[in-house]
């Protein structure tokens, strides 16, 4: 949902092809979907948010000479050299930062048991990779737009909605359907 929010804030007319493989290990189906997204809908970048299955989407990008966005960690650093070469950036789930935050809070005598805590961009809970391929291949205009988008979230101009409630999930489905090719 954050991806759609960010992309449509930068380009209100953008089209986003969203597909679900239904699990985290089906690389074959993810590759099939990736190839279809590129060949049928002219997707020029794919974010494979599906655990190991996303690697199939990366393989589709490699075969079609398109960019891939990694997920959870810096996949450019963990992929084989051929897949790393087409990984433009990665959406980061900074689990290490959340663990440090939790133990710092615990050491300070704060107890959050039973409380929902959201560690977003401002707290370092999530982020994106802006060095390596991104730094090398992104235009200055793209880098500026990415920084503007980050700043808009940090200063509250853009609120990243959640899908963790029924209302939020319904909003995600509606928004996803609005931007389909």
How should these model regions be labeled?
Residues 1-181:
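A residue-level marker of the well-folded mature domains of exported/periplasmic proteins
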């Amino acid at each position: 949902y954050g991806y759609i929010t960010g992309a449509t804030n930068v380009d209100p007319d953008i089209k986003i092809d969203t597909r679900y493989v239904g699990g985290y290990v089906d690389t074959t189906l993810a590759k099939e979907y990736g190839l279809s997204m590129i060949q049928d809908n002219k997707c020029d970048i794919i974010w494979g948010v599906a655990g190991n299955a996303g690697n199939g989407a990366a393989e589709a990008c490699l075969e079609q000479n398109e960019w891939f966005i990694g997920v959870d960690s810096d996949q450019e650093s963990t992929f084989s050299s051929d897949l790393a070469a087409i990984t433009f950036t990665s959406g980061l789930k900074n689990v290490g930062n959340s663990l440090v935050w939790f133990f710092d809070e615990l050491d300070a005598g704060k107890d959050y048991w039973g409380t929902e805590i959201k560690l977003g961009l401002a707290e370092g809970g999530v982020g994106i990779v802006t060095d390596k391929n991104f730094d090398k291949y992104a235009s200055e205009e793209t880098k500026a737009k990415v920084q503007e988008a980050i700043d808009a979230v940090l200063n509250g101009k853009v609120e990243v909605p959640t899908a963790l409630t029924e209302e939020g999930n319904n909003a995600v489905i509606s928004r996803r359907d609005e931007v389909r090719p």
